[in-house]
Amino acid sequence: MIRWFKCFMRMIFEQVGLNMESVLWSSKPYGSSRSIVRKIGTNLSLIQCPRVQFQLTSQAAEGNHPHQFREDAVASFADVGWVAQEEGEVSTRLRSEVWSKTAQPLPGELHQPGHSLGRQDSVPNLLHEEPAPRSTVIANEEAMQKISALENELATLRAQIAKIVILQEQQNLTAAGLSPVASAAVPCVPPPPPPPPPPPLPPPALQQSMSAIELIRERKNRKTNSGPIPTENGPKKPEIPNMLEILKDMNSVKLRSVKKSSGDTKPKVADPTDPAALIAEALKKKFAYRYRRDSQSESDKVIPKSETNTKTEVVLFGPHMLKSTGKMKTLIEKS
């Protein structure tokens, strides 16, 4: 099998024009990457296909030289995905193929940028757009008329609001004391007078030395010296109580105990149908029983047996029915 393979390889190399020994065992002039397949391919008389070369060209250069790459054009990245529409067929072609079919312009004609390049023919021309239709122009005019009408309505509304505000201010002034005749005669409301200047502040030394209580006393003395102030016909406004005056003599107040005799106070006759009296009586009984029970636990008073024996009611159920086991006595003795 190996001998047959060797013979087959020799026959192939002889037909190509190579010696098998020189191919396999001779030195490699092309380096270690040179293979037998490459050597066979270089010796065969095959037509080599042209390699694709890409060249980047600017749009300005294309516009300046419209007939430069028509004969032997080199493909560029601009041709990738470029679609030419011709004779109802859509296909991807190079610009050179389309230019060869189009008629070449005369040298005397002016260069038109919209029709110089096939690529510009395929791209929609945004500079030379069609004029807007008449219907859109009419619609724009109608919209402008509506906007102007709305602006006029807004202006009238503003004027009405201003009149209403002026009337309200005039009514407020008449209620404050002005006569309605004078307010009706004046078309515009006069500006309000400037506020009176604030009273001069006392010197800082007096403010620091005088306390709040002293100020209150001085004001009281001034009121008493000036005499009674004539009261107005209108209702008198209630004065706001001052807490400093109320709490001023709190430490000097002493309470006195008063003893009341039992004959002075007469018990009120309670109405049996009054719900408030019934609730008060029930609460008195409840809290009296609780107070009595707490006082008994505090004083550790022993209830005499005579009181318990006088009870007529017989308790059916209770702790007296339990049998004594003696555990309570042991617990009491231990404690």
Curated annotation (Swiss-Prot):
Residues 1-48 form a transit peptide. Widely expressed in embryonic tissues with higher expression in cartilage and hypertrophic chondrocytes. Specifically expressed in hypertrophic chondrocytes (at protein level). Its main location: mitochondrion. Pfam families: Mito_fiss_reg. It comes from the Eukaryota. It is found in: Mitochondrion. The keyword Mitochondrion applies. Residues 182-309 are annotated as: Necessary and sufficient to promote mitochondrial fission. One of its GO terms (cellular component) is mitochondrion. Residues 134-170 form a coiled coil. Keywords: Coiled coil, Mitochondrion, Transit peptide. GO terms for biological process: aerobic respiration; mitochondrial fission; mitochondrion organization. Residues 219-240 are annotated as: Disordered. The keyword Transit peptide applies. Belongs to the MTFR1 family. May play a role in mitochondrial aerobic respiration. May also regulate mitochondrial organization and fission. This is Mitochondrial fission regulator 1. The gene is MTFR1.
